[in-house]
Amino acid sequence: EPYRRQRQMCIRDRIKLWQGEHPPEAPIPAHRMQAVCYGHMLCVTRGLPAVDVRVVYVTRRGKVQGEFPERLTAEECRAEFQSVLLPYLRRIRAVRRHTRARNASLAALKFPYANYRPGQREMAVQVYTAIKRKKRLFACMPTGTGKSSATLFPALKALGEGLTGQVYYLTARTTQRQGALDALARLHQQTLRLWALVIDAKDKQCPTHTLCHPDYCERAKGHFLRDTEAIEEMMNIDDWSAENVRAVADKYCLCPFEFAMSLCEIADVVICDYNYALDPAVHIRRIFDAARDVTLLIDEAHHLPERIRDMLSGSVDSAGLRKLRTVVGKAAGKKHPLYKAMTDVIRAVDNLLLPEDGSTEGTLPTLPDDFDRVCLSLADAFMDARQEHFPWEDAGGRLGDTLMPLLSFNRARQRDSADYAILWEGRRHPKITAFALDSAGYFQQATQGLSGVTCFSATLHPLPEMRLLLGGAEDDACFAMPSPFPPEHLQIRQVDVNTRYAHRSSACVEIARQITALVTRKPGKYLVFFPSFAFLRMTAERLMLPCQVQEKQMDEAARAAFLDAYRQEGGDALSLCVLGGVFSEGIDLPGRQLDGVVVVGVGLPQVNLYQEVLRAHFERTLGDGFLYAYMLPGMQKVTQAVGRVIRTETDTGVALLLDDRYSYPAYRRLMPEHWRVSR
């Protein structure tokens, strides 16, 4: 204050959170430069000849760990400030040059095929219009119709015309990215100038697999001091493939994931998981919390309601907390703040008044006032503990696994309670879940004001119901693209088999007989889909044919090996898979790579506490709980599985539907219009 009164000098503090084990010996260069920039701004705005700046490191509790004062003249501040700006000025100029070249190439861009498939041109017009009007579009596009090209091409045209600033192509699974990558590869054959980036999960990109902290990872230490030069190098490369991004990250010793996050700011197209745009815990804040000049193309959008519910839900697992508390007690002692905070939450869970009817799960109308308080305190204690470096090796993984659901639970409790149900599971050590019911309201809010959002899928059907589930407004367009393939190319036959849970043991014999008859009558390559692993194994024991069986846990190499039997020329193949799994969506087996599929059951989700709570919610809000909670998700999985058969105009094949319910009008209404089902 004395310096300010004299208007000759001013002290400018930059206070930073210190997460290291030992007090710092010197300020981190980026932190010092931040303080210098503030000092320069003070000198300019107040006409000061000099300024005192100070970097102060404190713990989360406010304890000072280090102070580094420095006196600089106004000229020294100006010189350092300009040195910081220069790389960004070079970046802005490079981006502008690229944008001019990109827009010129996009103006000349032509559709990547000689002719549009039926409905493709109309779909492209709908996508372009949605971007131009900044509206949402809900589109049902049968499998094999070239949906990636039909959505990316008009979006890129809009990008070149300045109707949007970036295009994000969102997928539910890694396997579903290939269609977008193939479409971009075909467009690149026209000398397209485009920075297209693919974001993989952080754990998949990590080359060190150590704790993500500067004290443990050399790539994390000083990352943001080195990434400016790396970004400049990337701007001189047209191909932003995962391999090239990783190579530049390796060259500059950068974290590949954080480097990709930085590149997101200037990329033209980003292909990534739903989470990076929609999950409040992990979405790219530098993009979606600031600019709205972004277009979303959301593939396999029928997954969105369930995925959004998962994103918005959170839990407090009493049993998991007890196990972690034991580890923390051994490592840090029972007086450690984290141990005490976990004890408070465990005690709060134990004190909940559960029904005395002997049930092991259910719902709670509300939670005590102090429950949220102790959960918030535990989250703070977790964050403090992650800064400490006493022996955490045994608890490191469990710490994160427990922290993330807890943080999600705390976020959920801060939202409108009417959008949630409080569930409890397990009587001895209960798990308490804040279960999100309303995905529509959140999706509507998250996409409000963006430069067009297109939700598309082969199973976004019936469109009015799906638009309702995703919070679409009445003026948001719906478009049903007709199948471009002759219906007679796909022979669909239904056989009455009672696959309901109580009859599965006896149904296995008939299912095995039907599979055997099909592959004997017409040898070839077939996929058989079951509603569960248990049903699959039960039938496999009765099937006297050589076959491969999907496992619960399969990495990418195992999945590729599983599909090798189909991608090799000639021969026969028979595989038993789970409906709704990785082999029923997002895989492309054209031509003679796949001759047919068998679908056992109608795909209804397993009856459990969560589905029953959803059913009751939809019964109250939409009038038909069973339709929205069970039938729609089930038939969407069935349609996806059958969609594996016909991928091109010349493909032919068969689909065998084994369940008597396929003859019911309620289920027939949920089938695609181009299906011709015989008995």
Q: What are the functions of these language-model segments?
A:
Residues K132-P154:
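Walker A/P-loop
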Residues N103-L106, K110, L163-V270, L278, ...:
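A substrate-engagement module of RecA-like helicase motors
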Residues R97-C140:
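Conserved pre-motif I regulatory segment
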Residues E1-R7, I11:
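Single conserved hydrophobic/aromatic residue that forms the stacking wall/gate
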Residues P531-Q553:
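Conserved helicase motor "Helicase C" RecA-like lobe of SF1/SF2 P-loop NTPases
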Residues T151, Q178, Y252-V269, D273-S377, ...:
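Signature of the SF2 helicase/ATPase Hel1-core->accessory helical subdomain module
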Residues V245-E265, V270, A281-I287, A381-T499, ...:
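A contiguous, basic/glycine-rich beta-loop/short-helix subdomain that forms a polymer-engagement track
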Residues D496-S506, K552-S663:
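Conserved RecA-like P-loop NTPase helicase motor core
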